[in-house]
């Protein structure tokens, strides 16, 4: 089974990643990946980013061939350390 460190490393290697991508890449069930991502987020190691698809070409997710779920993309990336000044 993959560890939190392996999940964090996979995000680092990809730059950013969706939960489903990490699930496939690491062969971990999606519910477990989601729980691990929540834990890493709570620990301050990664950040959750909801992508804004308001610039969709069709202007309406209802008629989008990708479906409504495609419009609600959430990615994870490493949290940038605060620079000391």
From Swiss-Prot:
Keyword DNA damage: no
SUPFAM superfamilies membership: Winged helix' DNA-binding domain
Keyword set includes Iron-sulfur: yes
Binding site for iron-sulfur cluster: 56, 61, 64, 71
A GO molecular-function descriptor: DNA binding
One Pfam family of this chain: FeoC
Protein name: Probable [Fe-S]-dependent transcriptional repressor
Lineage of producing organism: Bacteria, Pseudomonadati, Pseudomonadota, Gammaproteobacteria, Enterobacterales
Gene name in the database record: feoC
């Amino acid at each position: 089974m993959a560890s939190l460190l392996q999940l964090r490393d996979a995000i680092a290697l990809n730059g950013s990643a969706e939960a489903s991508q990490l699930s496939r890449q690491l062969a971990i069930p999606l519910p477990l990946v989601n729980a691990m991502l929540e834990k890493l987020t709570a620990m301050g190691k990664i950040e959750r980013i909801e992508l804004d698809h308001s610039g969709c070409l069709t202007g309406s997710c209802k008629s989008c061939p990708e479906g409504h779920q495609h419009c609600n993309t959430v990615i994870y990336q490493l949290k940038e350390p605060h620079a000391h000044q």
